[in-house]
Amino acid sequence: MKQTIKKFSRHRMERSSLCFLTILIIVSFVLQACAPNVSAGNLENMITPLVPTSAPAPTSGRPEYGPGELVDYIAQSGDTLPALAERFNTTVDEIMEANPIIPLDATTMPPGFPMKIPIYYLALWGTAYQSLPDHAFVNGPSQIGFSTSAFVASTNGWLKNYRTYAGEKMRTGAETVDYVAANYSLSPRLLLALLEYQSGALTQPEIPAGKYLLGLKRSFYEGPYLQLVLAANTLNNGYYSWRAGKLTEFELLDRSLIRPDPWQNAASVSLQYYFSRLYAGDKYHASIGPEGLARVYQNLFGDPWLDSTIILPGSLQQPALRFPFLQGHIWAYTSGPHTGWGSGEPYAALDFAPASDVSGCFTVARDLYTTAMADGLIVRADIDGVILDLDKDGDERTGWVLFYLHTATDSRIFVGKEVKAGEPIGYPSCEGGSSTGTHVHVARKYNGEWILAAGPLAFNLEGWVTGGGELAREGTLTRGALVVTACECSDFSTQVISEVSSK
């Protein structure tokens, strides 16, 4: 039987928080001390053509644990208690009981933190082999200094001379990879490795015949660029579903069931999920094993596991944020947690719409502009979104950034502009992405990783905290006893007022 624990006193919570912080600091120092100096991989003579081959089906090799048996687990970047509970088929309460040092208000676990987790065994757990670290998955700090254009120019594959129309302009193959990498916040190295593994993009002179280069069959998504878009979307679906504790099982093309090993990391599970959409049997197991994509990545860019970069540190906290509209104004909360970019996970975004007597797409009054939710520097501003960099280092791949979508072109702020909280970003509109009505779409990223809008690191806007629903776009904003429910209907129950003055 699963057990629950009693409520903890404030004294225990404060003591646990202090002890947990101490361990977090110690673990951080140890990890930094062990971090090697990693240089960019040699761009010459590293490309090894590889196609999917046969391999036996690997298993996790885990024993049939007794119900509630305590197992050892070392926390990984981005781990949260709710997700760990889903992965190990247990409860947050039981994890807390087994690890009393963890405070009740814990967000992310400190990477390297040793834990005991009560496990409830499930059959068909997959391989324990980890093919890619999380920092090599996202478009984060580990990608700084890497030039996709220079790398592709040093190769002899078809991508070098590829040209396509993407994002309202003609782009080279390298520019196309960077465009997809920026929008989905995915590592350009990973996208290049995927293109090489599945199509020989860096070693073969000709593009493989057929409409669906990567094997992802969907109407109107033909050709390398749109296939790469589908691949990026699928990868994000897998990565962030694992982050949220939702991807505990999936099927291969032959309908065989896979349950990712609970000890897995998000990037490796994402690749397992991605290849499950394409293959079955030996071909699937080869693609996720050491001789599959992982080998191609290492041949191209070196061993990613030598880089000790941590994407999400322990006890991560959101900085103070205000609503994305003027103080004293009332807007409608039109959509709860939904995709940050693309479709499906990550459910990182919220939508707000200004008051209006009309529905659909319309031009707003001049005082209904979208505002900065915090002080920062504008590092990207185009139809694909505005990025507000809160640490002002000029790079959206580091630290906290805020993402705005659907700002009108004629009023959009420009790159390089430093803003204070409450200052204009642009007018809400229907421009950019898919939209059925004038609104602004906002999301957060940290070190290149989309931060889920609900959960342990939920949006907190002026004390209003996001709660998720059963489906995308459902959800609430709660402050004390007050609850606002998201609805595209923009009725009275969706209205919320900004009460924080501009600086």
Regions from the PLM with identified roles:
Residues 26-29, 34-69, 100, 120-137, ...:
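Ser/Thr-rich, Proline-interspersed low-complexity disordered segments
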Residues 54-93, 113-115, 119, 131-132, ...:
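Primarily a LysM-type cell-wall glycan-binding module
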Residues 128-285:
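Catalytic glycan-binding domains that act on GlcNAc-containing polysaccharides
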Residues 217-334, 473-503:
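Non-catalytic cell-wall polysaccharide-engagement segments
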Residues 313-316, 320, 331-373, 404:
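Short glycine/threonine/proline-enriched tight-turn/helix- or strand-capping micro-motif at secondary-structure
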Residues 319-321, 364, 371, 417-420, ...:
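Acidic, glycine-rich catalytic/binding loops that coordinate metals and/or anionic ligands
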Residues 333, 370, 376-378, 416-428:
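A structural signal for short beta-strand/turn segments enriched in small hydrophobics and glycine
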Residues 364-415, 437-439:
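Zn2+-dependent peptidoglycan hydrolase active-site motif and core
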